[in-house]
């Protein structure tokens, strides 16, 4: 089996530890262990004192009952037994695609998007066609393109919402139409929902609550600010959950027992995390928008209150060279747009510490001025 190099992950693996001002990541500023445990007034010592004599044995195969119940409560129609714990959303996507896609299948994805959603199907022998998001259309999903691409042999439509890297959302009306199109050919719809928006005016809806063959993947990495515990999940109906169980045994035995505990703790206190993160997004997005308004060499379609944005750069050199030179000269890290097959752009993660964002943007402006 052949698979393409994973552009974003390869870039970050090579360069992120050299960054002084990392404005490339797409998570919201990570919680410390003390902050996470302290959400309900518990201190770290107390939290671990209760667990110090527990054996570090295998955990729950599919996630603890408490975990499954907390995750199921995030949806309107999903039963706890149909939640399967995974190693982050990447593990959830891998599980779903590994279970469903076969050589000769037809898959529809979007571009740009998270590379996993189309290169895993390609590696399994599927043909992949793309709905191309266009900057001049504010990166909005084109339903007419989707209708033209879907065919009787289409097995699955693989998307993400909000989109990585652009931060744009598949709103309720669009999602319902996607389900309607998929239903005409009995195709599955997988949506990576790891960037569920924090302020959406009721426009965000999970695919699993819209479509009987919908697959929602998600994790605690982005919206919930704890990527380090590596906990994600699939949410589906009962038939798909049963299919996934068989394949999951080959990809993951269980999550860590402490990770499951911390995940449950986070989900039980999710309103406090979301309140904190709404504040970070609102304040930092205002900083980003003001910077863009004053920066003549940058354009931005504003993200939908999610933690990733995608800027257009007016530069002469290729974006990868630009980003390497920027990092080496200033310590500022971006992800070049070419990692998403869109050159002359860059992913800018604006939900880091405010001081990091402000200094990073200032240095980026100084570097852009030198390009004249």
Predicted regions and their residues:
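PLP-dependent enzyme catalytic core of the Aspartate aminotransferase-like
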Residues: 77, 148, 316, 325-334, ...
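Helix C-cap/helix->beta junction micro-motif
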Residues: 124, 184-185, 295, 330, ...
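Active-site PLP-lysine loop of aminotransferase-like
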Residues: 210, 214-229, 239-256, 338-339
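Conserved glycine-rich beta-strand-loop-beta hairpin in the small C-terminal domain of fold type I
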Residues: 264, 280-289, 300-313
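Active-site pre-lysine segment of PLP-dependent enzymes
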Residues: 122, 129, 140-153, 165-188, ...
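PLP-dependent aminotransferase-like
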Residues: 73, 101-159, 180
């Amino acid at each position: 089996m052949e698979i393409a190099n994973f552009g974003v992950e390869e870039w970050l693996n090579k360069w992120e530890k050299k960054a002084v001002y990392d404005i490339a990541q797409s998570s919201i500023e990570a919680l410390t262990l003390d902050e996470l445990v302290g959400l309900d007034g518990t201190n770290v010592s107390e939290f671990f004192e209760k667990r110090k004599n527990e054996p570090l044995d295998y955990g729950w195969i599919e996630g603890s009952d408490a975990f499954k119940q907390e995750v199921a409560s995030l949806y309107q129609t999903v039963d706890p037994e149909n939640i399967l714990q995974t190693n982050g959303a990447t593990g959830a996507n891998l599980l779903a695609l590994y279970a469903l896609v076969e050589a000769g299948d037809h898959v529809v994805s979007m571009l740009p998007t998270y590379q996993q959603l189309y290169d895993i199907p390609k590696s399994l022998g599927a043909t992949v066609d793309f709905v191309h998001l266009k900057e001049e259309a504010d990166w909005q999903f084109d339903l007419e393109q989707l209708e033209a691409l879907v065919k009787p042999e289409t097995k699955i439509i693989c998307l993400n919402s909000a989109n990585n890297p652009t931060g744009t959302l598949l709103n309720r009306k669009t999602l319902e139409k996607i389900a309607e199109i998929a239903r005409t050919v009995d195709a599955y719809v997988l949506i990576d929902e790891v960037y569920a928006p924090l302020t959406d005016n009721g426009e965000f809806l999970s695919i699993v609550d819209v479509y009987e063959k919908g697959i929602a993947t998600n994790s605690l990495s982005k919206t919930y600010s704890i990527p380090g515990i590596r906990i994600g999940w699939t949410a589906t109906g009962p038939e798909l959950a049963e299919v996934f169980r068989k394949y999951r045994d080959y990809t993951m035995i269980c999550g860590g027992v402490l990770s499951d505990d911390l995940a449950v703790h986070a989900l039980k206190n999710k309103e406090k995390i979301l309140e904190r993160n709404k504040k970070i997004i609102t304040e930092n997005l205002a900083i980003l928008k003001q910077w863009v308004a004053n920066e003549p060499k940058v354009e931005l379609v504003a993200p939908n209150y999610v933690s990733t944005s995608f800027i257009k750069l007016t530069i002469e050199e290729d974006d990868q060279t630009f980003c390497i030179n920027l990092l080496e000269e200033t310590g500022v890290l971006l992800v070049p747009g070419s990692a998403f097959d869109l050159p002359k752009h860059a992913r800018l993660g604006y939900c880091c510490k405010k001081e990091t964002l402000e200094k990073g943007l200032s240095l980026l402006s100084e570097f852009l001025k030198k390009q004249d």
